[in-house]
Amino acid sequence: MSTKYKLRVTGECKQNMKLCKRRGLPMDELWTVVGKLLNGEQLEEKYQAHILSGDRKGQWECHIQPDWLLIWEIHNQELVLVLLNTGTHSDLFGKKYKKR
């Protein structure tokens, strides 16, 4: 099956994917989102996809579940989808993250 983008996954993301699997998170949900991104599809509103700012300017985040995130960026020149990280809010943003 041909996709719009090639997939690249960072080492940190691979490590955290294993952690998510050990936590019993439904990995098929993650791969459903990744499949949509690889095909250049817009994610449904339920995923709350949005661009990040600050240190993560140019990166995107979505909510696979309320406290399970995926962070990625797209390199259009290479047509590469780069999965940067996945995990809970505290996994990804540490102590500086505060729930509102």
Where are these regions (language model features)?
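Enriched for short, Lys/Arg-rich terminal
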Residues: 1-6, 15, 22-27, 67-69, ...
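N-terminal first-folded block
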Residues: 8-44
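Flexible domain-boundary/linker segments
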Residues: 30, 47, 51-54, 69, ...
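A short, surface-exposed loop/turn module that caps and links secondary-structure elements
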Residues: 36-63
